[in-house]
């Protein structure tokens, strides 16, 4: 089961589509399994939380992710 992508929406609000400037964004993905994909960093094993860093204006990878504030923890 995969996450719903909110990253692109946030980047749209940030004006990334009209700007070619690359901005690094931290995205947090809540997976329904313990093992994170290779290009993800396991940030919280208990909450099945995987983190990926990608650049704005670059198409996202085949994985989808939620965007949460830094330090966000699932209830």
Swiss-Prot record:
Main location, first listed in the record = secreted
Tissue specificity, in the record's words, reads:
Nacreous layer of shell (at protein level).
Entry keyword set = Secreted, Signal
Span of the secretion signal? Answer: 1-19
Cell compartment(s), UniProt: Secreted
**Example of a GO cellular component annotation carried by this entry:** extracellular region
Recorded superkingdom: Eukaryota
Keyword Signal among record annotations: yes
Q: What is this protein called?
A: Uncharacterized shell protein 12
The organism is Margaritifera margaritifera
Its ancestry begins with: Eukaryota, Metazoa, Spiralia, Lophotrochozoa, Mollusca
